Amino acid sequence: MNGSQQICFTDSAGKALFSIPENGLLCLFYGNGDRHFAVCHRLDDTHAEIDGVNYSLPDFAKRMKHNQISFAPA
C-alpha cells in the first residue's frame, strides 16, 4: 500500500471533514472530558480500521454522533 494514502473522515451525512494519513492518529473526545487516541488504517476509500475495529466511515461518524463523541485529527 502506498504510504501517502489518506483516510477521509466524514460527518454522519457523508460530508468530508478532514483527512489523515495511513497509520495516522484520530483523537476521540468524550463528553466527560476524557480523550482517546486511535490508530487508523485505510482499508479502501470508504472503510478504515480504527483502533482495531473495521468501520464504514459514514457509519463510524453516525456511531460517534449517537454516543456524543467528537473526533478530530491528532
Annotate the PLM regions.
Residues 1, 7, 24-26, 38, ...:
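Generic low-polarity alpha-helical segments
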Residues 20-54, 58-60:
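Acidic, low-complexity, intrinsically disordered interaction modules
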Residues 53-74:
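Intrinsically disordered, low-complexity, charged/polar segments
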Residues 1-17:
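Mixed-charge, Lys/Arg-rich low-complexity intrinsically disordered regions
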